[in-house]
Every structure is written in structure tokens, then in C-alpha cells.
Curated annotation (Swiss-Prot):
Belongs to the pancreatic ribonuclease family. It comes from Saguinus oedipus (Cotton-top tamarin). Its EC number is 3.1.27.-. GO terms for cellular component: angiogenin-PRI complex; basement membrane; cytoplasm; cytoplasmic stress granule; endocytic vesicle; extracellular space; nucleolus; nucleus. Disulfide bonds join 50-105, 63-116, 81-131. The keyword Signal applies. The keyword DNA-binding applies. PROSITE patterns: RNASE_PANCREATIC (PS00127). Pfam families: RnaseA (PF00074). Secreted ribonuclease that can either promote or restrict cell proliferation of target cells, depending on the context. Endocytosed in target cells via its receptor PLXNB2 and translocates to the cytoplasm or nucleus. Under stress conditions, localizes to the cytoplasm and promotes the assembly of stress granules (SGs): specifically cleaves a subset of tRNAs within anticodon loops to produce tRNA-derived stress-induced fragments (tiRNAs), resulting in translation repression and inhibition of cell proliferation. tiRNas also prevent formation of apoptosome, thereby promoting cell survival. The active site is at residues 37, 138. This is Angiogenin. GO terms for molecular function: actin binding; copper ion binding; DNA binding; endonuclease activity; heparin binding; protein homodimerization activity; RNA nuclease activity; signaling receptor binding. One of its GO terms (biological process) is negative regulation of translation in response to stress.
Amino acid sequence: MVMGLHLLFLVFILGLGLTPPTLAQNDLRYNRFLEEHYDPKTKNGNDRYCDKMMRLRNMISPCKAINTFIHGKKESIKAICGTENGVPYNGNKRKSKSAFQVTICKHRGGSPRPPCQYRATAGSRNVVVACENGLPVHLDESIFRP
């Protein structure tokens, strides 16, 4: 029994070593995308929301000039990378078929060092993302829907 567990553990460890690095890197880039741009708890952020979220997400050293938070379901955002909720756009990017509630946080200017202050613009927009292996890894832009 003990020998069987050791063998099973060895096979597991070897399997981890054989995991393609690109898959792990894609997960890392996708998780970074979520950290920078995903907030399902808010619908429309204001200036205080931007100040707080940019600080909580560690985007203030130096102050990031602009950042967009998407307020939607994670599955709907991932679906932009497929045909369910995305269409090809401007080369290798994907544009969402449906609009998302977003909050765009723009640095008010001044010093690039904290404390950073942001102005919020909230609304419904289509988003454009770059995808790798079916996952969004970069938010390129948001497009206002007339």
C-alpha cells in the first residue's frame, strides 16, 4: 500500500513537470487580466470607486493612466474569445457581441506617484480583448454603443 502511494505520488509529480509552460503562462496572463479588469460586485463605479479599486489592485505605483473594470459574469467575458460572445476584430483581437457594464478610471493628472486620484466614467460598452488559448489576456479597448 505504501509503495503504491509512493508510485502514485511520483507519477503525479512527473505529470506536473510535463505540463506545458505555455498553459501555465496563459493561466497567469488570464489571472492578471482578471485582477486588472474584472469586478463583478459593482455595476457603476464613481470617482471614489476608482481611487479605491486602483489602490486595491496595486495599480498606483506609478499611477496607471487609465484602466477599465468590466462588471459582468466571468463566463461571458471568457466567451468573447469564442463564437458565443465574440467576433473577430482588427486583426487577432475579439470584440464582444454583447455590451458589458464598465467603469473607466482615468488618472486626473499631476504627479504619477501616490496618492493617485481618478475620474470615473461608467456605462454600457462592447469590449475588445486579445485572447490566448481561449482566454482573454489583454483588454484593448471598450467601444461605446450608440
